[in-house]
Amino acid sequence: MIGYYPEHCPFCGALNVNFITAEECSENYKVIETEVNDKVIRLNSSPPLGLEHSAYCIETKNQTVWIDCPSVFSKDIERMDKIMFTHHHFLGASNLYRSYYSAFLWIHEEDSKQNLAQKYSFDKKFENDYNLFDIKAYHINGHTPGFTFYIFKDIFFICDYVSVSSGNMHFNPYGPRDKTIEGAKVMNNILNKHELRKVCGFDYVLDYSDWKAKFDDLLNSLKI
């Protein structure tokens, strides 16, 4: 998929004897779509592939934009114009979508420098917050140097900055904890200026009010 064959998976550590090719992946897996609302669709690999994650498709008035990318490449999915990343851990099969659909890949400059991103081609490496087709991008650092979250109208895209399990919320442990916490505080100040209804995470979609209550509890626990 990315032009070279590492000795082991950088995420789970599996040896390359257990790898499958991009062609085998496309033959045995597909991308399924689940509606979040009339403008946003959740994208997942089916059956779940490896450390499975969700990407999201946004239908703006101007273009079709993805937030992050599925691990499976499919020629059956509708064309996207851009794929904008929260961070470099969720590049998925984006280079194949870029080649087949001529999709433009956008990522923060700092994450484009990371080892996992070195074999990918990016069309725009942004450094500042921006607003494109009503999609607002906010760089907060933290979990990764270039971590960026997105807001489209009343939908908030957070990826895996925090996880939710057994009713509790936790910060992503992979990354500098102090910077992750500082990024969360910056994010909280931004969120408090928006009216939001849904949160789209790497493996969940939640009502914003429920998610925010857990997020507030997490931030408050830092003060104890």
Regions found by a protein language model. Give the residues of each.
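Active-site HxH/HxHxD metal-binding segment of metal-dependent hydrolases
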Residues: 52, 70-133, 217-220
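N-terminal juxtadomain amphipathic helix
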Residues: 1-46
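Structural signal for conserved beta-strand scaffold positions within catalytic alpha/beta enzyme cores
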Residues: 42, 85, 107, 121-125, ...
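Metallo-beta-lactamase
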Residues: 1-8, 15-18, 64-65, 103, ...
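Short, flexible loop segments at the rims of nucleotide/cofactor-binding pockets, characterized by
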Residues: 42-48, 63-68, 82-85, 134-140, ...
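Conserved beta-strand hairpin/beta-sheet module of binuclear metal-dependent hydrolase folds
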Residues: 28-73, 148-164
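Short, solvent-exposed secondary-structure boundary motifs
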Residues: 39-51, 112, 116, 129, ...
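Short acidic/polar capping segments at secondary-structure boundaries
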Residues: 48, 71-72, 89-90, 110-112, ...
